[in-house]
Structure formats: C-alpha cells, structure tokens
C-alpha cells in the first residue's frame, strides 16, 4: 500500500466562521441544494454528525459513481477544521483503500478566508496516484465551494 499526498489552498471572500458553518457544518443539506448536478443527497447512516459518523453521499443519475460513504474523523469548531475519510463507494474503485481529507478554514485580514486542504490517497498494492487525477478531484471540490460561495453572496442573511 502506498500513500500519496496532495495539498492545496483556495481563497474565498466569505468569512471563515460563516464558510465553516455553511460548507462544513450544514453542507449536507446546502450542497445538494446549490449543486444538485454534483450531489443528489447526503444522509447520516450512523452517528450524529460528529467523529465516527458515517455518511452516504449519493450522486445524480448519469454520474460515473452511484455513491460514496465517508466517515467523519474530526470536527474542530474552534479552529474551523474538519477531517473525514472516504471509506466505500465507486470513487475508490479497485485501486484505492481510502482517501483521508482535512479542510482547515483560516480567516484572512480582508475578511475572507483561505481553505487549506490536505488529501491522503491510500492505494491498494503498488498502484500510484497520478497528479492529474488528484488535481481533477480538487477541481470538483472547488466547484462545490464556489456554488456555496455564490449562494452565500446572494443570501447575506444565511448561515451567519
């Protein structure tokens, strides 16, 4: 088994606390609403949203995968940090055992925020992750962020 790391940063004009609340804490309901072409639904299979919770993310018809299951590893409200692992489903395929993800949202002096994202791809056997594949996954995540950001800009009273 190999572990391949991919780290990235992206900026947002949304303040860190508001973005954490909307994108992370309430994302299970907000993201399917603002990006139904990407995610149909999110449901808790077990747990209450905290560490140990298992979530099932269902993708719309026509997507390359039907669903994935994720386990919440950490929710740090004080430091706007969220960690989770993708543990089952089509996105893992025959080559990945799991993907561990960490998102930390940091406030910027201008009132916006920086999302610091770390992904660890745990492969099966001697399979290697290609940089372009990891970059494509990052771009899909960034598209979800932009959908949430657009919603928040259009609804200034939401998720405050």
Swiss-Prot record:
Where found? Answer: Cytoplasm
Q: Name one GO molecular function term.
A: signaling receptor activity
- What's the main place this protein lives? cytoplasm
Q: Which domain of life is it from?
A: Eukaryota
Concerning InterPro entries, the annotation shows: Bet_v_I/MLP, Bet_v_I_allergen, Plant_def-hormone_signal, START-like_dom_sf
Q: What GO biological process terms does the UniProt entry carry, in alphabetical order?
A: abscisic acid-activated signaling pathway; defense response
GO cellular component annotations, sorted alphabetically? cytoplasm; nucleus
**What UniProt keywords apply to this chain's record, in alphabetical order?**
Allergen, Cytoplasm, Pathogenesis-related protein, Plant defense
Amino acids binding brassinolide: 55, 82, 84, 101
Q: What is this protein's function per UniProt?
A: May be a general steroid carrier protein.
List, alphabetically, the PANTHER family matched.
OS08G0374000 PROTEIN-RELATED, STRESS-INDUCED PROTEIN SAM22
Indicate the family of this protein.
Belongs to the BetVI family.
Name the UniProt record assigns to this protein = Major pollen allergen Bet v 1-K
Q: Which organism is it from?
A: Betula pendula (European white birch)
């Amino acid at each position: 088994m190999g572990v391949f790391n991919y780290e990235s940063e992206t900026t947002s004009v949304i303040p860190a606390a508001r973005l954490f609340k909307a994108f992370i804490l309430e994302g299970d309901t907000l993201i399917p609403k603002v990006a139904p072409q990407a995610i149909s639904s999110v449901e808790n299979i077990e747990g209450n949203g905290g560490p140990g919770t298992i979530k099932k993310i269902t993708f719309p018809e026509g997507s390359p995968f039907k669903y994935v299951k994720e386990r919440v590893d950490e929710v740090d409200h004080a430091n706007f940090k969220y960690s989770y692992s993708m543990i089952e489903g089509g996105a893992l395929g025959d080559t990945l055992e799991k993907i561990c993800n960490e998102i930390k949202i940091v406030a910027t002096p201008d009132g916006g925020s920086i999302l610091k994202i770390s992904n660890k791809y745990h492969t099966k056997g001697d399979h290697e992750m290609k940089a372009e594949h990891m970059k494509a996954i990052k771009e899909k995540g960034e598209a979800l962020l932009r959908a949430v950001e657009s919603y928040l800009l259009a609804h200034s009273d939401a998720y405050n």
